[in-house]
């Protein structure tokens, strides 16, 4: 039974402990440095990070294309370490869809089932079900060389879903699509995952893809997981400076702790003004304050927390980005949503100040 939308199963589809992968060489290359991870059944889970961070290595270990150097890797409680790829009930969708151009849409979708020796009647009904799922029934007899990139993506997904895998791995499958089609496919992928109830493990370097589709995200760098959480938790409460910088746009401000009380901290900013903010870190010393551009506002010079000069205002249609050179030498960007009656009160070169409520500031230990 598929859990209701938004409710995650307690069953672990994938569980890894101290998972490590070292490639031989001079010197050896540690692609994965002892990762612990649990991915729930019926979860859309994303591995997010820059190139070379280890996210695709995890995917290849789960698929069975690589063998870990050490550590454990289980699927629904069964060890995968000695299980060959074809016995894992796992399918993979790659960046290149690897469709057969001389075959029709229906033939491509049914190819894997034929290789498994399924009866023709079962293949026919499953192919019809998959074409309906990805909304491609009207193109069943069209060759895949004659359909669009987005339609090819749907065929590749249908082919991977047809054998009813327990886990579907997706290795940056949207990167070849144009911007508008990519956004549409983000919604499509989440719909497919919800309707099928299959665990999706998605690899990407694109933060928007991760935030849009995922139930949870693992942010990775240098072969390690920096933070695992819901999109909102990771965006609003980054664990460290790397996560705050990689997910969304962020301003970083130096600050000094002057007092702590429970989970709140009083800080002195570079301007000499003070602010109280929630903090996971206790103690004194120098910290970094992370403030999202949309959480700040532009004010007159003597009204805000951080005085400076408005160096630029860039119009983006839906919003305007204001670039401020703060008096302490820090560059600050804030974002204001536009509306038909929006007016910019300040001109380039004018003295201004930046304000933000303490509740939206994230305190990061240096």
Curated annotation (Swiss-Prot):
The complex is composed of two ATP-binding proteins (PotA), two transmembrane proteins (PotB and PotC) and a solute-binding protein (PotD). It is found in: Cell inner membrane. Residues 14-247 form the ABC transporter domain. Belongs to the ABC transporter superfamily. Spermidine/putrescine importer (TC 3.A.1.11.1) family. This is Spermidine/putrescine import ATP-binding protein PotA. ATP binds at residues 49-56. It is an enzyme of class 7 (translocase). Part of the ABC transporter complex PotABCD involved in spermidine/putrescine import. Responsible for energy coupling to the transport system. Keywords: ATP-binding, Cell inner membrane, Cell membrane, Membrane, Nucleotide-binding, Translocase, Transport. Its EC number is 7.6.2.11. Pfam families: ABC_tran, TOBE_2. It catalyses: ATP + H2O + polyamine-[polyamine-binding protein]Side 1 = ADP + phosphate + polyamineSide 2 + [polyamine-binding protein]Side 1. The keyword Cell inner membrane applies. One of its GO terms (cellular component) is ATP-binding cassette (ABC) transporter complex. The keyword Transport applies. It comes from Ruegeria pomeroyi (strain ATCC 700808 / DSM 15171 / DSS-3). Coiled coil: none annotated. GO terms for molecular function: ABC-type polyamine transporter activity; ATP binding; ATP hydrolysis activity.
């Amino acid at each position: 039974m598929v859990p209701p939308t938004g409710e995650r199963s307690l069953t672990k589809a994938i569980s890894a402990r101290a998972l490590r992968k070292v490639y031989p060489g001079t010197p050896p290359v540690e692609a994965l440095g002892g990762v612990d991870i649990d991915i729930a059944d019926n979860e859309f889970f994303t591995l997010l990070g820059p190139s070379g961070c280890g996210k695709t290595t995890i995917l290849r270990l789960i698929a069975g294309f690589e063998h870990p150097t050490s550590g454990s890797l289980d699927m629904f409680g069964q060890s995968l370490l000695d299980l060959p790829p074809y016995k894992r009930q796992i399918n993979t969708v790659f960046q290149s869809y690897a469709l057969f151009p001389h075959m029709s849409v229906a033939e491509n979708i049914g190819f894997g089932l034929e290789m498994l020796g399924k009866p023709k009647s079962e293949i026919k009904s499953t192919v019809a079900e998959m074409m309906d799922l990805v909304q491609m029934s009207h193109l069943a007899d069209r060759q895949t060389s004659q359909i669009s990139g987005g339609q090819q993506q749907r065929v590749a997904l249908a082919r991977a879903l047809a054998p009813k895998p327990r886990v579907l791995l997706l290795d940056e499958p949207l990167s070849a699509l144009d911007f508008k089609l990519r956004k549409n496919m983000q919604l499509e992928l989440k719909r497919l995952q919800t309707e099928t109830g299959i665990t999706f493990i998605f690899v990407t370097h694109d933060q928007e893809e991760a935030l849009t589709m995922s139930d949870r995200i693992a942010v990775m760098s240098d072969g390690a997981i920096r933070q695992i959480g819901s999109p909102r938790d990771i965006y609003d409460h980054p664990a460290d400076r790397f996560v705050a910088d990689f997910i969304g746009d962020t301003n970083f401000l130096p600050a000094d702790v002057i007092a702590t009380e429970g989970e709140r901290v009083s800080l002195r900013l570079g301007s000499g003004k003070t602010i109280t903010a929630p903090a996971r870190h206790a103690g004194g010393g120098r910290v970094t304050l992370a403030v999202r551009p949309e959480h700040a506002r532009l004010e007159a010079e003597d009204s805000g927390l951080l005085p400076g000069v408005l160096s630029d205002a860039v119009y983006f249609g839906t919003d305007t980005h204001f670039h401020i050179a703060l008096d302490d030498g820090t560059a600050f960007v804030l974002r204001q949503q536009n509306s038909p009656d929006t007016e910019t009160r300040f001109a380039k070169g004018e003295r201004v100040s930046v304000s933000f409520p303490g509740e939206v500031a994230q305190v990061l230990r240096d």
